[in-house]
Swiss-Prot record:
Membrane is among the record's keywords: no
Organism taxonomic ancestry: Archaea, Methanobacteriati, Methanobacteriota, Stenosarchaea group, Methanomicrobia
Plastid among keywords: no
Disulfides per UniProt: none
InterPro entries found in the cross-reference section: Ni_insertion
Top-level division of the source organism's lineage: Archaea
UniProt KW keywords: Nickel
Protein name: Putative nickel insertion protein
Length: 396
């Protein structure tokens, strides 16, 4: 699988991401042409050295560096740029991530918000250029290893703020990206955080595979370690996706079966991906249960709170963060004939990234309704629906 990997060991900003993609092989002539046709800027690209490492440096030269724009104005600029449909969609989505974060931090609606640093022409150029470069690279997967956010404080249009600045923190809170802090200055900007959040899946390490090419995008900071963003194009093994999960666990010994039964539904509504409850013998020979919950990191705290509230447990363990291999899933409808009637059943189709179908399962509620209506055994309705789905796929 053709995979793009970002390694932000020294942070990431919009220009570092753009530079890293160009250094990796994205056509700089095309990118400059697209940027300058979209935004009133000029672009220079050169090779520089950061702590002994050669890297590509991208400089966006603006004519109106103090311009403050609303979210609507930013979107209008992107829509008027005649970009490829995918690039336009992605660029708007990146700015929406930034806008939603800024609006929440400042306690206002997106429509009321006015962008300062991230609304200027250089930020527009970075986002449009990066979205176009990724569009042209035709990768099947994008990964990001843990991000160094930096430390200390930074001077902004809103005054001196701690690093990471509140908008960056808000973007990261729902991203699933792993972060750490090393340094005494801002290394991860809101634009960099939004681009990585939108495009990349988190990974705690490099994937297994062959490194095809490596690039380095230069940042502006002068630090002890090279202030560069490393990019890699890899041929990774396997066609299954990876998902970033956490496992929550707690022991209870004084909770009734009725409460535990209700707990399943409650936790799933709070965002749990799976819940299992295992009988166990606790201290002093008491009968109890171990509750295991699989969840995305952004939902873990809410689920842990609900576990405490529902069961009275005083602590919930979070096991080390895990990755799981997952199949891609899509829902389709098939028609089955029983007697003289035609019934529609939803089926879930699991497939890998190359679209090879791995498994098909009929939706239980549809099959149960049909079984009750026509008197055919449930397992026979399920068999017919899944068989019809397989036949449809084999005909394609």
């Amino acid at each position: 699988m053709r995979t793009l990997v970002f390694e932000p060991f020294s942070g990431a900003s919009g220009d570092m991401i753009l530079a890293g993609l160009i250094d990796l092989g994205a056509d700089k002539g095309e990118i400059v042409e697209v940027i300058q046709a979209s935004v009133d800027v000029s672009v220079t690209i050169e090779d520089i050295t950061k702590c002994g490492i050669r890297a590509t440096d991208v400089n966006i030269h603006t004519k109106d560096s103090a311009r403050i724009r609303s979210f609507g104005e930013l979107i209008d600029i992107i829509k008027d740029a005649n970009l490829p449909e995918e690039v336009e969609k992605n660029a708007i989505a990146v700015f929406r991530i930034i806008g939603d974060a800024e609006a929440k931090v400042h306690g206002m609606s997106l429509e009321q918000l006015h962008f300062h640093e991230v609304g200027q022409d250089d930020a527009l150029a970075d986002v449009i250029g990066s979205c176009y470069a990724i569009h042209r690279m035709k990768v099947e997967n994008i990964l990001c290893t843990p991000v160094n956010v930096g430390g200390g404080s930074v001077r902004t249009a809103h005054g001196t703020l701690p690093v990471p600045v509140p908008a960056t923190t808000e973007i990261l809170s729902g991203s699933g990206l792993e972060v750490h802090s090393n340094g005494d200055r801002e290394l991860l900007t809101p634009t960099g955080a939004a681009l990585l959040t939108y495009f990349a899946n988190p990974s705690d390490q490099l994937p297994t595979g062959k490194i095809l090419t490596t690039g380095y995008g230069a940042g502006d900071a002068e630090t002890d370690m090279p202030n560069v963003l490393r990019t890699m194009l890899m041929e990774t093994t396997g066609n299954l996706s990876r998902d970033h999960m956490e496992v929550l666990e707690t022991n209870v010994d004084d909770v009734t079966g009725e409460v535990l039964g209700n707990l399943f539904e409650t936790l799933m509504k709070e965002g749990a991906k799976d819940v299992t409850i295992t009988p166990a013998t606790m201290k002093k020979g008491r009968t109890g249960h171990i509750i295991h919950v699989i969840a995305h990191p952004e939902n873990s705290e809410r689920i842990a709170r609900e576990l405490i509230r529902q069961t009275g447990t005083l602590g919930v363990r979070i096991l080390p963060t895990k990755h799981r291999f997952i199949a891609e899933r899509k829902m389709e409808k098939v028609n089955i004939i029983i007697g003289k009637q035609t019934f529609q059943v939803t089926v879930k189709i699991a497939h890998d990234r190359s679209d090879e179908v791995l498994h098909i399962s009929a939706e239980f509620e549809d099959c149960r309704r049909i079984s009750q209506e026509c008197g055919l055994p449930l397992k026979e309705v399920i068999r017919r629906a899944e068989e019809k789905a397989w036949n449809n796929i084999l005909k394609k």
